[in-house]
Amino acid sequence: MSSDPMRNIRNFSIIAHVDHGKSTLADRIIQLCGGLEAREMEAQVLDSNPIERERGITIKAQSVSLLYKAQDGQNYHLNLIDTPGHVDFSYEVSRSLAACEGALLVVDASQGVEAQSVANCYTAVEQGLEVVPILNKIDLPTADTERAKAEIETVIGIDASEAVAVSAKTGLYVEQVLEAIVQRIPAPQPRDTEKLQALIIDSWFDNYLGVVSLVRVMQGEITPGNKLLVMSTGRSHQVDAVGVFTPKRKTLAKLTAGEVGWVTASIKDVHGAPVGDTLTLTSDPAPKPLPGFQEVQPRVFAGLFPVDAEDYPDLREALEKLRLNDAALRFEPENSEAMGFGFRCGFLGMLHMEIVQERLEREYDLNLITTAPTVIYEVLKNDGTLVAMDNPAKMPPINQINEIREPIIRSNILTPPDYVGAVITLCEEKRGSQISITYLGNQVQVAYELPMAEVVLDFFDKLKSVTRGYASLDYHFLRFQEGPFVRVDTLINGDRVDALSVIVHRHQAERRGRELCEKMKDLIPRQMFDVAIQAAIGSQIISRSTVKAMRKNVLAKCYGGDISRKKKLLEKQKEGKKRMKQIGRVEIPQEAFLAVLQIDNK
């Protein structure tokens, strides 16, 4: 190594849309640098969880330290920091990028640029990173490198004349990627302070070590035995061990400035080491933390209830364990009259919710009922207090409410020109307001402000279907905005079912109420008595449908004769039904709770 220890370090991450070959390229880079032997190089090395593999999402083991001997004869220390690709995890992406000096922008040469990579690339450029375009999948017959280069220049606006064309699958030209990293990505720069500053890129829970934090040391050094201060929580922890991933975990004597590695300090849960926070020495702290830290706020909420009430303690334990690994997951106990005991959970987005639900069902063998996801609303009461409401059933009485505000997001949609009309129609249906339409080569960027409540249910699926799968979407939260919202309750035989309450725009309330009643009528099984299904706003009923009773033919044994005999039997049956209706309870199947989701899918 040269006299300046940071001169030969290169910290970089890979930005790519889902399925553009990010994990495969990472595998090839690890293989070329000899991180793993050939027999160990089976599948995507960096995706360790089975759900990650299936869905192609990256959560853990997010950094690899490699040694590379370049063509100029020098040894370089490469730190690859992997980033999640999905919009739900955009905060994690921004933290991963903050730890780097450069990024590889991987674009599938057969498909061109997609919205996710555009958003992440803008984040990288804003943070001053050197972006190196890589065109992947050039072995495919449909690959068109010139078109992909032109798209990078028009859509993202960075120079792609020196883009490296590779095939990660076959390993063709991957060596050139390593040379580009060494030559074009700058080395880490020393900071203006001598005191220790380290950025937490990610944290996860290990059963033996407690919390393992992946950190980028900006200035100073970390050695075992140091007492570290977590700047946002104000707590101190003693360092047990430090090291790097190669991608196996390897222990080192210390981590110095410019390096990326892991730190364990017997922290008991991931909330003790939040992503994006700054570590410094307790004895000699840095004057201020690194910029950009924010608490991760859940955006989508849903109720999770065990089908069997006896599973409630198991569900609590499973959620506690998941939370050790997932700082964005929030939950609190909830009691529903219809479903019994369960939890109200907060997620980053729909994908995050699906992953959590899938992990609970797979890893912990739980059978769950999920209520319709809702977003968080702000309610301004008449006395001037502002409350955040994540559960429609907890909405204050109408006479106490001054205004209700819903979350608005800014969405950027990239679509081929043929489908612009369909995309605009879809956004207008979802109460969107158009910001801009920009024609970029053979892609169109449509920017809309949309209510988040309309996006969380089925917007993504509908967008894919109206554009035959070609459009891609990226969004971020903007603000809360006031609007005429009401809560539509569902009453079954006069009893309110809290899990079926939804908050809707007043103009859509009647239609939603009518559709909900019709849908429930098909799903609730017939009973021995009439079941009345009503949709109501406050005390005003806006729609009703009835599940007719099953009835026995009590007149079957009567032959001709006097009508009064028949009347007596019918009256007796009617009395019995009336009594049953008073004491009878209607079992509501799981499909009925999901009906709330499917109303818009007609």
Curated annotation (Swiss-Prot):
GO terms for cellular component: plasma membrane. It is a peripheral membrane protein. Its main location: membrane. GTP binds at D19, H20, G21, K22, S23, T24, N136, K137, I138, D139. It holds the Pfam family GTP_EFTU. PROSITE patterns: G_TR_1, G_TR_2. One of its GO terms (molecular function) is ribosome binding. The keyword Thylakoid does not apply. Residues 7-189 form the tr-type G domain. This is Elongation factor 4. It comes from Xylella fastidiosa (strain Temecula1 / ATCC 700964). The gene is lepA.
